[in-house]
Amino acid sequence: MNIVILAAGTGKRMRSALPKVLHPLAGRPLLSHVIATARTLQPSRLVVVVGHGAEQVQAAVAAPDVQFAVQAEQLGTGHAVRQALPLLDPAQPTLVLYGDVPLTRASTLRRLVDAARDGSYGILTVTLDDPTGYGRIVRDAAGFVTRIVEQKDASPEQLKIAEINTGIIITPTGQLAMWLGALKNENAQGEYYLTDVVELAIEAGFDVVTSQPDDEWETLGVNSKAQLAELERIHQRNVADALLVDGVTLADPARVDVRGTLRCGRDVSIDVNCVFEGNVTLADNVTIGPNCVIRNASVGTGTRIDAFTHIDGAELGANTVIGPYARLRPGAQLADEAHVGNFVEVKNAVIGHGSKANHLTYIGDADIGARVNIGAGTITCNYDGANKFRTVIEDDVFVGSDTQLVAPVRVGRGVTIAAGTTIWKDVAEGVLALNEKTQTAKSGYVRPVKKKS
């Protein structure tokens, strides 16, 4: 089977310099959703017709299995499909999809393909409570499709028809080439409409079969930011419903956003206003507090992530405790039972089993052993303005508050570092490390007093 995806439109109503099909839905371009669905049908040829912003669109979705045809002039959907013909296998049927209709299920498309498997011309239709503005499916007394009539051309009787054309079709490719060549642009827009092909198919004696989706939102397209927002909510609610079916507890299904893939174990709980991006895995009994952002991360069994925590590119072991207001950046690896508390930032660092950095700390480019306590205000000084260096803290080290570790530096097992110490040399095992300081008290000091105005 050939699949052609039309993605050449300008999208004027989006009021954006970004091509319409590249506007994001759940963190991915609209067109990427359509391509992903198309791939599940295993087409022999997958062709995307580009036009407005062609180079930008091609760069965004380029892949070995995707070919591109260019519609240099926007002369209608029929003209767009015509540009793809040289790239198609004429011996295989062609399914036509739209780059701005992202939510059509693969199962819906398979039903349409199956309905037209005998070489018929197939149309995906949908029945709407309010079909205003759409082309109506006109049938004869026996129920066979005779034509598609646009709203402006419909008679009062035809306007009562609730079944409308979605634009998604499957057709024999050899005949499609002939029908496209016979299209005329005798309309107000001067365009060649793909919908006109159905009458040519009927005139040629082809059966026209139809199929419908399970839900009408599967056929909704995007022509404005309002419609994009509507589809985003539909998609996110579908994702939330699937999570609920899988046993995930959502404090409010309307207030969780998944912009990628979220895999959850048993008894996972997610509070409100959480965003998941990229590939995220939550193991059994994970609890996520409100207002967290988690991107490309794996979270171990029994972990608790408190409110306002940001996690990006991190790996968390079992029974870790993170936040609130913590930030784990790419390369952060936390072993089982590690704690990273409020206003702690970890980047490209390993924190060992049971180690804790509970508040106000920066840990970057570091290897921290097991059972280490990092006091408040500790900083690994890892950057000299040009190069990054690592800090190594071995097992059972106690780091006092307001400590600076100037990398590259190693702190041996069992060391105690006094509060307010700057470490710039390696420290041997088991010692107390401190900077000698003298505390002085002076009598007779008078504090300055502000003058009254």
From Swiss-Prot:
Ranges for region N-acetyltransferase: 247-453
Catalysed reactions, semicolon-separated: alpha-D-glucosamine 1-phosphate + acetyl-CoA = N-acetyl-alpha-D-glucosamine 1-phosphate + CoA + H(+); N-acetyl-alpha-D-glucosamine 1-phosphate + UTP + H(+) = UDP-N-acetyl-alpha-D-glucosamine + diphosphate
GO terms, biological process: cell morphogenesis; cell wall organization; lipid A biosynthetic process; peptidoglycan biosynthetic process; regulation of cell shape; UDP-N-acetylglucosamine biosynthetic process
Region ranges (Pyrophosphorylase): 1-225
InterPro entries (UniProt xref): Bifunctional_GlmU, GlmU-like, GlmU_C_LbH, Hexapep, Hexapep_transf_CS, MobA-like_NTP_Trfase, Nucleotide-diphossugar_trans, Trimer_LpxA-like_sf
Signal sequence coordinates: none
Residues that bind acetyl-CoA: 376, 382-383, 401, 419
Pfam families given in the database record: Hexapep (PF00132), NTP_transf_3 (PF12804)
Gene3D superfamilies attached to this UniProt entry: Hexapeptide repeat proteins, Spore Coat Polysaccharide Biosynthesis Protein SpsA, Chain A
Cofactor binding annotation: Binds 1 Mg(2+) ion per subunit.
EC number: 2.7.7.23, 2.3.1.157
Keywords: Acyltransferase, Cell shape, Cell wall biogenesis/degradation, Cytoplasm, Magnesium, Metal-binding, Multifunctional enzyme, Nucleotidyltransferase, Peptidoglycan synthesis, Repeat, Transferase
Binding site for UDP-N-acetyl-alpha-D-glucosamine: 6-9, 20, 71, 76-77, 98-100, 135, 150, 165, 223, 329, 347, 362, 373
Pathway the protein acts in: Nucleotide-sugar biosynthesis; UDP-N-acetyl-alpha-D-glucosamine biosynthesis; N-acetyl-alpha-D-glucosamine 1-phosphate from alpha-D-glucosamine 6-phosphate (route II): step 2/2; Nucleotide-sugar biosynthesis; UDP-N-acetyl-alpha-D-glucosamine biosynthesis; UDP-N-acetyl-alpha-D-glucosamine from N-acetyl-alpha-D-glucosamine 1-phosphate: step 1/1; Bacterial outer membrane biogenesis; LPS lipid A biosynthesis
Matching SUPFAM superfamilies: Nucleotide-diphospho-sugar transferases, Trimeric LpxA-like enzymes
Region (Linker): 226-246
Cofactor(s) needed: Mg(2+)
Active-site residue numbers: 359
GO molecular function: glucosamine-1-phosphate N-acetyltransferase activity; magnesium ion binding; UDP-N-acetylglucosamine diphosphorylase activity
Subcellular location: Cytoplasm
Binding site for Mg(2+): 100, 223
Chief place of localization: cytoplasm
Protein family: In the N-terminal section; belongs to the N-acetylglucosamine-1-phosphate uridyltransferase family. In the C-terminal section; belongs to the transferase hexapeptide repeat family.
Subunit details: Homotrimer.
Protein name per its UniProtKB record: Bifunctional protein GlmU
Gene responsible for this protein: glmU
